[in-house]
Amino acid sequence: KQAFISGMSGVVTDIKNLAMAEMPIYVVVAAVLSLLILLLTMDSLVTPFIFLLGIGMAIVYNMGTNMVFGEISYITQALTAILQLGVTMDYSIFLLESYEANKVRYDGDKNRAMAHAISNTFTSVTSSSVTTIAGFAALCFMTFKLGMDLGLVMAKGVIIGVIVCLTVLPALILCFDKAIDKTTHKNLIPNLDGLSKKIVKGWPVVLVLFLVLLGPAMYGNSNYEIYYDIAGALPQSLDSAVANKKLEEKFNMNSTHIVLMKNGMTSKEKSERKLRM
């Protein structure tokens, strides 16, 4: 290559290109891992796909409504799908479990069971979603604009996730109800009643154990390093990393400094100012 671009401009450009290129990959990986976990923990082969379909729609709605902000950071764009998938999955599980319980209670009346399930789910997820929204909204008070950017997008994403869970997902469950029943199988997770009884019976031991572990946890919290070198965290094969390395090797410098001087200074004054730096 004839030329290289170093400094923050090159680093920021490489971070943006890397994040946008890898975003589809880790979104697919997250979806596959979520699907595998749901297949292991749910008692129907169809429900995991319904959950991911509903959450996928909520993510698309959230991404689409970002146009109201005019623009968002590429970092927010890269993180939103994964975060929304993680924080809103529980709402779908609440709805399905409530629906299954009410279906038994109302002797197979699916519409009535789903109506009560929606009501029960709304009550259950209200406090959970409100605290989640408040947590993301707190980011808006950061001076760093990225905090407001990420906070607003994710708070909106949680709201949309709740709305989809209470509107679109019930329709999907009712639509595929027969398929859900036909693919129902024995739960692959072993019964934990025995462990639950032991924990309840031996709660003083559990409490003491966690109090003992609190000390090492507090020590660890105060004794790990935080790195601030963004460029050093990037793959060394990126153009900006290659440029910075060549800058250091050929010119014995790895950072650029800009000196601002008053207009009209004489050469002597400039030399004296340089010596004082």
Q: At which residue positions do the language-model features occur?
A:
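Surface-exposed amphipathic alpha-helical segments in non-transmembrane regions
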Residues: 1-2, 277
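Membrane-embedded transmembrane helical bundles of large multi-pass transporters/channels
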Residues: 2-228
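Juxtamembrane segments of multi-pass membrane proteins
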Residues: 196-198, 204-277
